[in-house]
UniProtKB/Swiss-Prot annotation:
The gene is Pdcl. Functions as a co-chaperone for CCT in the assembly of heterotrimeric G protein complexes, facilitates the assembly of both Gbeta-Ggamma and RGS-Gbeta5 heterodimers. Also acts as a positive regulator of hedgehog signaling and regulates ciliary function. Disruption phenotype: Conditional deletion in photoreceptor cells leads to 50-fold decrease in Gbeta-Ggamma dimer formation and more than 10-fold decrease in light sensitivity. A 20-fold reduction in Gbeta5 and RGS9-1 expression is also observed, causing a 15-fold delay in the shutoff of light responses. It comes from the Eukaryota. The modification N-acetylthreonine is found at T2. Gene3D superfamilies: Glutaredoxin (3.40.30.10), Phosducin, domain 2 (1.10.168.10). Belongs to the phosducin family. This is Phosducin-like protein. SUPFAM superfamilies: Thioredoxin-like. Forms a complex with the beta and gamma subunits of the GTP-binding protein, transducin. Interacts with the CCT chaperonin complex. It is found in: Cell projection, Cilium. One of its GO terms (biological process) is regulation of G protein-coupled receptor signaling pathway. The keyword Glycoprotein does not apply.
Length: 301
């Protein structure tokens, strides 16, 4: 049983503050703080939080960030490579088509220069060895024949000898014909030496020179004198654009009484009074193209 003094003393002891006890308590708290490791509040804080961003800056988070970075870098590099391949393929196709077009244009230009006579066959073959000579010659013949055909059909075609019935017909034939037409008039009379030969030559030349108009007229029809008939026949008059450009009287003095078409043709060609003969030109082009060798530098006109 406690006394009043014990109670009083005991109550004082309960409320008594001791500095030694506080110091012991502080030491225990410090010891507990040193021994207990720091524990993360939540496990999620150590993981990556969305889009590869790590909240934790520890070793594990750094490694994950590095792996994610390398993955993105690899994907970007692969995409760049694919884009580069697509670009290279596109450029190569466009460049190839452009080069093919330029090559074809150059071939056509070289061919045109050759046809125009500016380049020999040897130069052409050296410049473009891939083009076959036979192919070139075929193209050349085709174009030359087309040019000759156009020239051949450009003017009127006659192909025969026309008989002039009167003096008025003689004047109309000279004045009313096209200015580009060459007209050859044989003035004749039956029984005059060389008349038959001249008539035969005119018929032959009319077929070989269809663009030239060959005519004949009796000297009596145009009112020629008997003296002219005796001394000047057979006569050959040549007109163009209404003008007399050739006048040959008594042709037998140059060709004799018996002559042929080739003789009369050569005689007229000496004076430049016959145009280029289309049939012979086409034949010469064919023969020259067939016999032309690869190493020859002969130009075909």
């Amino acid at each position: 049983m406690t006394t009043l003094d014990d109670k009083l003393l005991g109550e004082k002891l309960q409320y008594y503050y001791s500095t030694s006890e506080d110091e012991d308590s502080d030491h225990e708290d410090k010891d507990r703080g040193r021994g207990a490791p720091a524990i993360s509040s939540t496990p999620a804080e150590a993981e990556l939080a969305g889009e590869g961003i790590s909240i934790n800056t520890g070793p594990k988070g750094v490694i994950n960030d590095w792996r994610r970075f390398k993955q993105l870098e690899t994907e970007q590099r692969e995409e760049q490579c694919r884009e580069m391949e697509r670009l290279i393929k596109k450029l190569s196709m466009s460049c190839r088509s452009h080069l093919d077009e330029e090559e074809e244009q150059q071939k056509q230009k070289d061919l045109q220069e050759k046809i125009s006579g500016k380049m020999t066959l040897k130069e052409f073959g050296t410049k473009d060895k891939n083009l076959d000579d036979e192919e070139f010659l075929q193209q050349y013949r085709k174009q030359r024949m087309e040019e000759m055909r156009q020239q051949f059909h450009k003017g009127p075609q006659f192909k025969q000898v026309f008989e002039i019935p009167s003096g008025e017909g003689f004047l109309d034939m000279i004045d009313k014909e096209q200015k580009s037409t060459l007209i050859m008039v044989h003035i004749y009379e039956d029984g005059v030496p060389g008349t038959e030969a001249m008539n035969g030559c005119m018929i032959c030349l009319a077929t070989e020179y269809p663009a030239v108009k060959f005519c004949r007229v009796r000297s009596s029809v145009i009112g020629a004198s008997s003296r002219f008939t005796r001394n000047a026949l057979p006569a050959l008059l040549i007109y163009k654009a209404g003008e007399l450009i050739g006048n040959f009287v008594r042709v037998t003095d140059q060709l004799g009484e018996d002559f042929f078409a080739v003789d009369l043709e050569a005689f007229l060609q000496e004076f430049g009074l016959l145009p280029e003969k289309e049939v012979l030109v086409l034949t010469s082009v064919r023969n020259s193209a067939t016999c032309h060798s690869e190493d020859s530098d002969l130009e075909i006109d």
